[in-house]
Structure formats: structure tokens, C-alpha cells
Design a protein with these regions (language model features):
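C-terminal hydrophobic helical "lid"/dimerization subdomain
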Residues: 2, 282-331
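Surface-exposed amphipathic alpha-helices with a cationic face
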Residues: 165-173
Length: 331
């Protein structure tokens, strides 16, 4: 087979990394049951971290980052998958310790591979990617705990981020009233277009004085940032409400007491998209292809780039300069 292209991150000096598009062969890929011709990948915050010397993502260099990929099977030793099958690969060790999706071909264990559900294209799957998948997991967790639109307002922290944007849009699509919080100035129109009914500042979810129990404001909440905002949401969620958490950009420490749990019956639901069990993973993708699908939003939130554009886009991502989703076309 002829050579194909992939984006490599390398580290020659302890505090310095470099990005370069190189040509490699299939034999250069790691072991796995399924070989896939990648059509699309995406950009997540974790992908940006993987390019940094101090990002604490990549341990061995040179390495191909990219935690998302969607494409078509070209070879499989697992009978569950055959040549020509459209598939999705996200999470697990892809783009972390296993060559990732910024490559025209990947080879992965079959247990990482999810069949593309009916109603979704490969392009659409990567517009969602890990960010959309995590948001969908969060919304589904609320629903599993009985959340319904008539319950009242649902708060979303970090709403202009990848997960927060999708969470806002999916909740709105399902009929929930969304209060979106963001630290980025001038994003009110963007959040309103996603479906937010109310937009508040980051500071609104980070009061100087944090009370163990504050005035009940939200029926439920999706926290994407951790730290103080999560503590605040626990103290302001109404009796019996649920709060999901999936990020820590605002801090990994949580300041709370038992009061929200034993006096208001609050449910704190952890969301882990990396090692989500396979049956649940398929269920979430089914929802993304059906009732969670955002047909009217997918194109306007998406900027399509090529492998050649990736280095600049990844740097922009780390600096917080990306709004919406960057889709990487590899076909």
C-alpha cells in the first residue's frame, strides 16, 4: 500500500514539542483488530493538551494525537466488523497512548469501535465527537434520574465550551429551559442560537461567599467545569434535582457539605466518557442519531479544516480561541 499522512507531535527537548505531518505505512500503526480509513476527526481540548510538553497527556514520542475518528473499515479480524462498515472510534486510549485520529488510517482494538448508527453520517458523528458524546451522556443521565422539561430551569456551566455547547443545544431541543453560564464575553447571541433561554456570567456561578445551601434556583444542572461552579450548583439545585459533572477546567477540588444530599436529596452524577461501557456507548450514539440530533445547528457551529490546518487550529484551541466545532476532513 502507498504511504499515507498523519500529524505527529514530537518532543526533542524537555519543555518543547513540535508538530509535523509525515508519511507512514500501515505497518507503522500499532496492533489492533480493526483497520479503518479515517474520513473525519475533530478537535477537543484534550487534543490541544496532547501537543504541549506539559500537557500530561502523551508519554511516548513521536505520537499521533486525536481522540476522535470516524471512517470505514478496510480490514478486520473480528467478525463483528467487515470491510466497508462505517464506524466511530472515540475515547479509550485513542490519541492518548495509542496512535490517534489525526491520521488517514488507524488500527484499533475492536472493543473501541462502534457501528455508525442509522440516521447519522460520518461527518455528523465527528461534529459531535467526544464533546457531543459527553454532553449526550450528561443529558441522558439527567433523564435516567427522572428529569423532565416541566421540572424547571436547567443550568449549564462552561456553556461556550464543546461539551457545554452541545448540552445547551440538546436540552433546548428536548424542550428544557436552559440557563447558560460562560466566562467568554460577547457570546450571548451564540448561546441564544444554541437554545439558551438565559445567559449569565461565569461569576454568577462563583459567588465570593459560598453557602452550603443557598436559594433553590435550578431543577437540574450540567456542570462542565468543576471547582466553585459545581459547588454552587449543588447548593442551588432544587429538592430532588440532579447535577452531572464531567470537567475540571475551573478546578478539581469540590467544596460542599452533606446538606445538599441529605436535606434536598440532590443526586451528583459523574460522567466518564472515556471508559463508558460498550452497551451504554451504543445507546448514547443512538440518541445522538435520533432524539438528540441537532440538524438545524450542525453546519453553523462547524468549521471544516484539513490535516494541513491542524497545527494552527490546535494552538488556537489551547488559547481558547475556538468557538463551536472544528471538523478535520481526512478523505
Amino acid at each position: 500500500m502507498t504511504a499515507f499522512r498523519a500529524l505527529f507531535v514530537d518532543q526533542k527537548k524537555p519543555e518543547e514539542t513540535s508538530l509535523e505531518i509525515k508519511s507512514i505505512q500501515l505497518d507503522d500503526l500499532p496492533e489492533g483488530d480493526v483497520t479503518i480509513r479515517v474520513h473525519y476527526s475533530g478537535i477537543n481540548y484534550k487534543d490541544g493538551l496532547a501537543t504541549l510538553a506539559n500537557g500530561n497527556i502523551v508519554k511516548n514520542y513521536p505520537f499521533i494525537p486525536g481522540i476522535d475518528a470516524a471512517g470505514v473499515v478496510i480490514a478486520s479480524s473480528d467478525p463483528e466488523f467487515k470491510e466497508g462498515d462505517p464506524v466511530i472510534v472515540t475515547s479509550y486510549e485513542l490519541g492518548v497512548s495509542h496512535f490517534g485520529g489525526y491520521s488517514e488510517y488507524i488500527r484499533v482494538p475492536s472493543k473501541w469501535v462502534v457501528p455508525l448508527p442509522d440516521g447519522l453520517t460520518l461527518r455528523e458523528a465527528m461534529i459531535y465527537g467526544t464533546a457531543g458524546f459527553t454532553a449526550a451522556m450528561s443529558v441522558l443521565a439527567l433523564q435516567d434520574n427522572g428529569a423532565e422539561p416541566q421540572d424547571g430551569k436547567v443550568a449549564v456551566s462552561g456553556a461556550t465550551g464543546g461539551v457545554g455547547s452541545f448540552a445547551t443545544a440538546i436540552l433546548s431541543e428536548l424542550g428544557f429551559s436552559v440557563v447558560a453560564s460562560s466566562g467568554k464575553q460577547g457570546r450571548e447571541d451564540y448561546l441564544a442560537k444554541l437554545g439558551a433561554d438565559e445567559v449569565v456570567s461565569r461569576e454568577a456561578f462563583q459567588p465570593e461567599k459560598l453557602r452550603p445551601l443557598d436559594k433553590e434556583q435550578f431543577a437540574h444542572a450540567i456542570d462542565c467545569v468543576g471547582g466553585k461552579p459545581l459547588s454552587y450548583l449543588l447548593s442551588t439545585t432544587k429538592y430532588g434535582g440532579s447535577v452531572t459533572t464531567c470537567g475540571m477546567s475551573a478546578g478539581y477540588q469540590l467544596s460542599t457539605t452533606v446538606y445538599p444530599f441529605i436535606l434536598r436529596g440532590i443526586h451528583l452524577l459523574g460522567i466518564d466518557s472515556v471508559y463508558c461501557p460498550y452497551p451504554r456507548r451504543k445507546e448514547v450514539w443512538h440518541h445522538i442519531a435520533t432524539d438528540f440530533k441537532l440538524d438545524s445547528l450542525l453546519d453553523w457551529v462547524t468549521t471544516e479544516i484539513t490535516l494541513q490546518d491542524l497545527p494552527e487550529a490546535l494552538e488556537k484551541n489551547i488559547q481558547g480561541g475556538i468557538l463551536g466545532r472544528y471538523l478535520v476532513r481526512l478523505i
